[in-house]
């Protein structure tokens, strides 16, 4: 698929103000079978080019992209929804390939972390919970956008849901996401989190400001009903 075609297919056609707030272009390499419908290619050049086209197409439609899963999920050998997933490649390989794609998107206002263990960098903690990995995202990849976790209830993370939330925040994550709908778990997460830091507030405001700048100032409700068929 050409980048221009990717941009067209990423265009939600003026429904952003009602349906779409954010969307997550996946910038990982296509290696593992469970990723095959979710990635843009096998090489840095392909993923960066098609990812940028998708990113620009979303912006043009008033939808704020959330780049994911930082700093790269493609070389993982297992599905992180189901259990621990590791990447065994060297730091030198990763910084020139998987991580490099995210460096190409350092201008993004929002990103999502990967629940992946990178053995060459931090073999003990998945990137979401690893201060070392988050420091790489901030310093080496120059990403200063709002950084959120993937779903805390995924099986790749150790410990209880509340301890996962605390560890992510202490590692440097700005926002933790709990997505399975269990209200009791959500309450337990809310009870253990600290207040956002001033830097997190700054990143939030930058993301909100960028998002608000994309939203149409007026909305034709009749035209929207016709487009949705309701």
Model-inferred region functions:
Residues 1-13:
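A generic, well-ordered mixed alpha/beta core segment in the N-terminal half of proteins
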Residues 14, 101, 177, 183, ...:
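Low-complexity, compositionally biased segments
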Residues 14-15, 171:
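Structural motif
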Residues 18-38, 42, 67-84:
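Active-site-proximal loop/short-helix segments
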Residues 46-59, 63-192, 196-202, 206:
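Second-shell residues forming the walls of enzyme active-site clefts
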Residues 194-230:
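Extended, intrinsically disordered, low-complexity segments
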């Amino acid at each position: 698929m050409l980048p221009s075609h990717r941009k067209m297919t990423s265009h939600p056609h003026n429904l952003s103000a009602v349906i779409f707030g954010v969307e997550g272009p996946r910038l990982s390499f296509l290696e593992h079978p469970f990723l095959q419908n979710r990635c843009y290619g096998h090489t840095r050049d392909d993923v960066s080019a098609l990812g940028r086209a998708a990113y620009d197409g979303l912006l043009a439609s008033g939808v704020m992209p959330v780049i994911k899963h930082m700093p790269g999920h493609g070389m993982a050998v297992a599905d992180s929804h189901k259990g621990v997933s590791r990447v065994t490649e060297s730091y030198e390989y990763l910084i020139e390939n998987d991580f490099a794609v995210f460096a190409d998107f350092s201008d993004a206002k929002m990103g999502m972390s990967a629940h992946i263990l990178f053995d060459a960098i931090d073999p003990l903690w998945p990137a979401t919970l690893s201060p070392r990995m988050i420091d790489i995202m901030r310093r080496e990849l120059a990403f200063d956008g709002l950084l959120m976790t993937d779903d805390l209830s995924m099986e790749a993370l150790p410990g209880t849901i509340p301890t996962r939330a605390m560890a992510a925040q202490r590692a440097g994550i700005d926002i933790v996401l709990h997505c399975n709908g269990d209200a009791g778990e959500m309450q337990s997460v809310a009870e253990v989190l600290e207040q956002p830091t001033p830097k997190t507030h700054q990143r939030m405001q930058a993301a909100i400001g960028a998002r608000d700048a994309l939203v149409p100032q007026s909305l034709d409700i009749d035209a929207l009903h016709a487009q949705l068929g309701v």
